[in-house]
């Protein structure tokens, strides 16, 4: 199948070369799609390990067989796999938090059962505590990404092949200013984001050793190519700042129909437009360039919160999903949390996230940092009544409350409870976190694990 690149196979609807002003207009038009917040989504990444011996690498044939079985499931979510074999489920945009929780839990139950039949388990940790990075997917995108990220050190391969996250996707917000305005939500995301890093830090190990970070995953992102992983600079309106950031970030690769993709060094997208070499970029190239940018908050029409480590256990993922949704989408909670985190801007300073003192403290110290602990206590305290106002089930609220009591109130994070890698098992990770939740996620009699997953829909966009 031909790639969607201009000039590769004749005429193409979007093959007209971009000019600079046209690219800026496109970016300003697609990055923040405003309106009252109504939809929510979640993207869950999981490490795949043997249930009994997670320290042993899963053989390729065994993994391929399990992947084939999972692909055959009638999932609602979009199913993809990351370069190191991590499994990712991307939910459909849901009309409410509970709809997102229900459909995602049903998909996960089916995936977990299918992997379990092969003696495998999805493990929720921000970084694989056992395995060294080893890429399984041999695709031009990942060949080019590996080559480009290798220029700044080994963190790129570790991120690609051994990391996993919970990514919460929320509407951009309203055009007008106020608690639900997109400008306020954009600013909130970059301050509250550090609190979420600290509260959900769950990756203290790498290759069998303690790293000194509660979130080793976040430390990896901070070590990568800064243009590709930093937030846009402050001081500009969000649309203008994002458009400039995209155009001034280096191009990871220039796709071609045959042979390896070109991996230029130091060529920004703006310079590519101006020089037109090795070929003029078109709309499809700009769209693809956007998929190679990994800031902690990525505007894709909606806001994609990318800073949260994967969480252990069958229900761990729903806590960051519920908390983030409540704090952004409930007007009362959003106002409270904005006042709570606004003073963190002074600690953050001028550098962009995640390379500023606030985010560094969050990744290294978790909630042992007094300022982040105080902010987290206020934020989680605001989330609980907001969840009730939003119609979250009692079981979901109880799960969030249990996490708050176990970690936030005590200035701890999940990383603080993990045993050394030699004592970790896929079973212990699952059993440990399941104590945070009740037997099901709904207030009614039905159990999510007994529900039949819905038929596939369109690809997830939230």
What are these language model-derived features?
Residues 1-156, 162, 201, 301, ...:
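Terminal catalytic/cofactor-binding subdomain
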Residues 99, 171-173, 177-180, 308-317:
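Conserved phosphate-binding loops in nucleotide/dinucleotide-binding enzymes
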Residues 123-153, 159-162, 169-298:
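Loop-rich catalytic cores of soluble enzymes, especially ATP-dependent carboxylate-amine ligases
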Residues 439-448:
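Intrinsically disordered, low-complexity segments used as extracellular stalks/linkers
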């Amino acid at each position: 199948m031909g790639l969607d690149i201009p000039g590769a196979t004749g005429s193409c609807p979007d093959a007209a070369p971009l000019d600079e002003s046209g690219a800026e207009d496109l970016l300003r038009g697609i990055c923040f799609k405003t309106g009252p917040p109504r939809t929510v989504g979640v993207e869950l990444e999981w490490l795949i390990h043997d249930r009994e011996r997670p320290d042993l690498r899963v053989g390729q044939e065994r993994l391929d067989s399990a992947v084939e079985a999972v692909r055959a499931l009638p999932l609602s979510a979009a199913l993809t796999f990351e370069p190191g074999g991590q499994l990712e489920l991307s939910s459909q945009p849901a009309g409410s938090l509970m709809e997102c929780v229900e459909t995602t839990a049903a998909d996960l139950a089916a995936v977990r059962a299918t992997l379990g039949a092969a003696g495998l388990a999805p493990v929720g940790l921000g970084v694989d505590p056992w395995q060294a990075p080893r890429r399984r997917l041999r695709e031009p995108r990942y060949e080019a990404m590996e080559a480009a990220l290798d220029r700044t050190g080994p963190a790129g391969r570790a991120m690609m092949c051994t990391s996993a996250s919970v990514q919460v996707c929320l509407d951009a917000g309203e055009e007008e200013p106020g608690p639900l305005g997109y400008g306020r939500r954009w600013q909130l995301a970059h301050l509250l984001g550090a609190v979420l890093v600290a509260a959900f830090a769950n990756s203290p190990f790498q290759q069998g050793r303690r790293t000194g970070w509660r979130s080793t995953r976040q430390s990896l992102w901070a070590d990568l190519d800064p243009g590709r992983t930093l937030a846009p600079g402050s001081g500009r309106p969000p649309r203008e700042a994002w458009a400039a950031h995209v155009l001034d970030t280096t191009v990871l690769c220039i796709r071609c129909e045959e042979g390896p993709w070109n991996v230029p060094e130091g060529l920004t997208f703006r310079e590519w437009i101006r020089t037109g070499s090795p070929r003029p970029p078109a709309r499809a190239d700009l769209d693809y360039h956007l998929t190679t940018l990994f800031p902690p908050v990525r505007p894709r029409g909606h806001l994609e919160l990318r800073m949260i480590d994967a969480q252990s256990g069958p229900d761990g993922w729903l806590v960051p999903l519920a908390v983030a949704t409540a704090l952004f989408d409930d007007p009362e909670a959003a106002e409270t949390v904005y006042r709570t985190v606004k003073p963190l801007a002074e600690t953050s300073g001028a550098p962009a996230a995640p390379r500023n003192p606030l985010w560094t403290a969050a990744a290294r110290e978790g909630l042992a940092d007094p300022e982040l602990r105080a902010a987290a206590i206020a934020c989680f305290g605001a989330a609980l009544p907001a969840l009730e106002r939003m119609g979250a089930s009692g079981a979901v609220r109880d799960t969030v409350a249990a996490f708050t009591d176990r970690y936030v109130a005590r200035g701890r994070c999940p990383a603080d409870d993990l045993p050394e890698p030699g004592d970790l098992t896929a079973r212990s990770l699952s059993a440990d976190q399941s104590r945070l939740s009740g037997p099901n996620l709904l207030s009614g009699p039905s159990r999510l694990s007994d529900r039949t997953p819905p038929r596939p829909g369109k690809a997830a966009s939230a």
